Amino acid sequence: MIKLARYCIAFLIIAGCGGEGPYQITAESQGTKIVVGKFTRSLLESDSSFSWYRSNYDAFSPDSASIAYLSTAMQNVHFIVVGGTWCGDTKLELPKFFKTVSLSHIPESHIEMYGVDRTKKSKDGLTEKYGITNVPTFILFSDGKEIGRIVESTKNGMEFDLVGLLKQK
């Protein structure tokens, strides 16, 4: 019986260590960390390799009138966000997006975020499914239907572009 218990424990340890999580992180020779797969912003907040996230988040001050509008208009909106932790545009726009949705009280459960490699490929075919060729891409959904996108960079600022997309809906 003890022998069986040891085998079961060994199996569980091996099985637990062999599985691949929802994302992978690879480090390039110059130190850039690339996240590929589904992850949350807590990864960006907790890993010092992504210091650009906190500094750009803190530096951004969105328009208060836009935040007031978005607080009501975005409550039933869901997002798919695709970015590259290696990409300059992602480093600028992703923190602004998260500050905007945080101040608008959008729940984390309404946001799915995926990292891609330098070829802009995801682990699960998401980039092909949604035709993503540039990052970052912010896709907005309402009632399961796509209502708009922000691709690569904003035109008027994150909060203003989100307001514009929601008013077109």
Language model feature labels by segment:
Residues I2-A10:
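Sec-dependent signal peptide recognition
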Residues I13-G16:
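C-terminal motif of bacterial Sec signal peptides marking the signal peptidase cleavage site
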Residues G18-S64, A68-A73, V163-L165, K169:
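Non-globular targeting/processing and membrane-anchoring segments
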Residues F79-T85, E108-S122:
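Thiol-based oxidoreductase modules, predominantly thioredoxin-like and allied folds used
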Residues T85-E93:
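Conserved redox-active cysteine motifs that mediate thiol-disulfide chemistry
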Residues M113-N134, L165-L166:
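Thioredoxin-like thiol-disulfide oxidoreductase module
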Residues N134, L140-K169:
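Non-catalytic, surface beta->alpha helical segment in thiol-disulfide oxidoreductase systems
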